Amino acid sequence: MKKLLEGKTPANEIKENLIEEIKKLKSDGINPTLCVIEVGDDPASKIYLRVKRNLAKKVGIKEIGLHFPANTSQAELLEKIEDLNQDPSINGIMVQLPVPPQIDPRAIFETIAPEKDADGFSPLNLGRLWEGQSDVIPATVRSILTLIDYYGIEMAGKNTVIIGRSVIVGKPLAAVLVERDATVTIAHSKTKNLSELTKNADVIISDVGKAHLVTEDMVKEGAVIIDVGMNRENGKLMGDVDFDMVAPKAKAITPVPGGVGPLTVASLMKQAVILTRKQHGR
């Protein structure tokens, strides 16, 4: 391993830049405001929400938290989102996932106004990514791009394998990397001979949630490895990549924890500020 792609340093830089940017907006009478909706009482969600709220407070974003009971109907939730869409004091809206089974996440993504879409999951914003026209990008995707840019990883012409096809990471990531002239292959649970794809990859990005999915024999010498997976095994947090075995072969690799993770909430706050600026013609 020649380079460890740690995310804490670039995340701190984003936070410091946001503090200054938000101070300037507030001096012009603009107060970035993010509404975060929680449905139910998922323990993991509460931890993540606390991190979001703490960072919002630190950088100067006004965070409005709305909590709905677990038995809330989809119609009730969507009606509230529609109200927030019309509220000019709200710049960004996000719903903490997962939501209870009676609520379809796709209906949420379709209802949040694209101009207030803090998560970047609305169909219109995702479609714009394929046209290279959107600066509204899902937070995890923005985090990966930040690492690529911060560490000067060249993507043009690189054979890039993305493992995972979710609308949250895999698909939008493919769109933005194609715009950067990467040659992108998306692999998934039905992909045959995954190792044949990864052995020829200059860059491997995994977001599956399966420990030890990417092993040393699947990676060529000098590849760049970005691990987005989050798994817990024997009380230890780890990614999709067998880090100890793969790292010696890699040109650069993210640790888990400490790689993409530290950037995700900072990226979400950055998106809230981008939305605020766009709404005020900045």
Swiss-Prot record:
Which molecular function GO terms apply here? methenyltetrahydrofolate cyclohydrolase activity; methylenetetrahydrofolate dehydrogenase (NADP+) activity
- Residues recorded as binding NADP(+), renumbered to this chain, are 164-166, 189
Pfam families in UniProt: THF_DHG_CYH, THF_DHG_CYH_C
Functionally, this protein is described as follows: Catalyzes the oxidation of 5,10-methylenetetrahydrofolate to 5,10-methenyltetrahydrofolate and then the hydrolysis of 5,10-methenyltetrahydrofolate to 10-formyltetrahydrofolate.
Asked if Amino-acid biosynthesis is a keyword of the record, the answer is yes
Q: Its Gene Ontology biological processes?
A: L-histidine biosynthetic process; methionine biosynthetic process; purine nucleotide biosynthetic process; tetrahydrofolate interconversion
**The protein, known as:** Bifunctional protein FolD 2
What is known about its subunit structure? Homodimer.
Reaction catalysed by this enzyme: (6R)-5,10-methylene-5,6,7,8-tetrahydrofolate + NADP(+) = (6R)-5,10-methenyltetrahydrofolate + NADPH; (6R)-5,10-methenyltetrahydrofolate + H2O = (6R)-10-formyltetrahydrofolate + H(+)
